Amino acid sequence: MRRLRKPPGLFRRIASLTMLAWVLGFLWFALLLPQPADDRTTDGIVVVTGGGGRIPRALTELRAGHARKLLIAGVDREVKPGDFAAEYGVEPRLLQCCITLGYDSVDTRSNGLEAARWVAAQRLHSIRLITTDWHMRRAAFDLAAALPDD
């Protein structure tokens, strides 16, 4: 006597579809990561802290003349400008004229708000955002949401 198989239950179908959607979403995310910006000049650079290499990259872009102003958002309140300059080899003249240490943000959303205030205060029209590739979409989204629509 042959046993009839019971069709998969609703729970298994939903779980399978959920897993498939997650895998496809992850593949989309991983394969379409944003690429580094070209050498185009912008008015300013915004770098959000949190990972190695971001600040040195921003300083390289600033020194190369790809922007005239730099905001480093999310700096710990314990970090003093002199300590920052010593850590990253920043000349006092460059620190004074061109670099703003932003102490107001603690997460990606507040990075966007802090950066938007800085962009408005500096009257900048174009900016370059520096963060990690996997963080770029979220950081760009939060920054765009905080900037005015003009």
Model-found features: residue ranges?
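N-terminal type II signal-anchor transmembrane helix
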Residues: 2-36
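A structural signal for short, hydrophobic/glycine-enriched beta-strand patches
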Residues: 30-150
